[in-house]
UniProtKB/Swiss-Prot annotation:
Disulfide bonds: none annotated. The keyword Lyase applies. One of its GO terms (biological process) is L-leucine biosynthetic process. It catalyses: (2R,3S)-3-isopropylmalate = (2S)-2-isopropylmalate. This is 3-isopropylmalate dehydratase small subunit. SUPFAM superfamilies: LeuD/IlvD-like. Belongs to the LeuD family. LeuD type 1 subfamily. Keywords: Amino-acid biosynthesis, Branched-chain amino acid biosynthesis, Leucine biosynthesis, Lyase. It comes from Citrobacter koseri (strain ATCC BAA-895 / CDC 4225-83 / SGSC4696). Its EC number is 4.2.1.33. Catalyzes the isomerization between 2-isopropylmalate and 3-isopropylmalate, via the formation of 2-isopropylmaleate. InterPro entries: 3-IsopropMal_deHydase_ssu, Aconitase/3IPM_dehydase_swvl, AconitaseA/IPMdHydase_ssu_swvl, IPMI_Swivel, LeuD.
Length: 201
């Protein structure tokens, strides 16, 4: 079972860039591992650090600004997560501590992979995202509340509605990954298997 996602309130960091691809999110040299942990250290590695080893932080990159330390909501521009289909991209984001990414649009494969890894991708209109960038710029350190049950983002004195399809919403609200979803039907699967001839078991 994965962690349930119902509602999250967190610090917002504004990444004011469109077409952020998966190679920028987690560069290919860090993909050797097959477990989901440890990738956060290399998130946006080529942007966060001035050296290849990731030991010299880039003071001009927004994730390194002290006011955004501990951010758990990433605000981005259109076509976030484009490029190759590596599942390591949402792994890196969640391992770093992000729970939500808000953007006008996402690459399709990244969008699906995010739900599989309990990272909530929230689509809002370009105009709404513009408003949120302006709000964060004027109020560094602001927190947003993201409510998956009500499908709204509360930011400042405004509320923004978003839509997640019923199946994905059900899975996230109940902490169901593909294994957990299968286990929901364990008794039905067992009953089906019992009906099969012995040579097919």
């Amino acid at each position: 079972m994965a962690e349930k996602f119902t509602q999250h309130t967190g610090l917002v960091v504004p990444l004011d860039a469109a077409n952020v691809d998966t190679d920028a999110i987690i560069p290919k040299q860090f993909l050797q591992k097959v477990t989901r942990t440890g990738f956060g250290a290399h998130l946006f590695n080529d942007w966060r650090f001035l050296d290849e080893k990731g030991q010299q932080p880039n003071p001009e990159f927004v994730l390194n600004f002290p006011e955004y330390k501990g951010a758990s909501i990433l605000l981005a521009r259109e076509n976030f997560g484009c490029g190759s289909s590596r599942e390591h991209a949402p792994w890196a984001l969640t391992d770093y501590g992000f729970k939500v990414v808000i953007a006008p649009s996402f690459a399709d494969i990244f969008y699906g992979n995010s739900f599989n890894n309990q990272l909530l991708p929230v689509k809002l209109s370009d105009e709404e995202v513009d408003e949120l960038f302006a709000l964060v710029k004027a109020n560094p350190g602001i927190k947003f509340e993201v409510d998956l049950e009500a499908q709204v983002v509360k930011a400042g004195d405004k509320t923004y509605s978003f839509k997640i399809d019923d199946f994905r919403r059900h899975c996230m609200l109940n902490g169901l990954d593909s294994i957990g979803l299968t286990l929901q039907h364990e008794s039905a699967i067992a009953a089906y298997e019992e009906k099969q001839p012995s040579f097919m078991r």
